[in-house]
Amino acid sequence: MKICVPTMGEGGMQEAVCQHFGRAPTFTIVDLDIGVIKVLPNVSEHMGGTGLPTETIFAEGVQVMIVGGLGPKAVLAFNQAGVVVFVGAAGTVNDAVDDWRAKMLAQADLDNACKDHKH
């Protein structure tokens, strides 16, 4: 299973979770099946590039997103693609994955999506 966490840099499991999904500098992908960690730059239009951040995630075959927060458009895009999203992550990638495993994070929906960019 591949899990993705929006992150502040390239520190792998010890990197800080970025609280703004679309503007995360990087995405850290953890493949739980084979123990591989991959860090991808966010090259979406949000960061001066092209495309949407969700497209980067879809291309990697991610099944679970663990985020601090994200907007309703991203929630809908992930839902339509079959990617399950959990909100409320904080700390490091390692902390976020541990919290997800412990069922401490809420599944994302339109009610708990961010309504503005003040997070």
Language model features with spans:
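Non-catalytic interface/targeting segments
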Residues: M1-M47, A59-E60, Q80-A81, G88-H119
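Short HxH-centered metal-ligating active-site micro-motif
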Residues: S44-A81
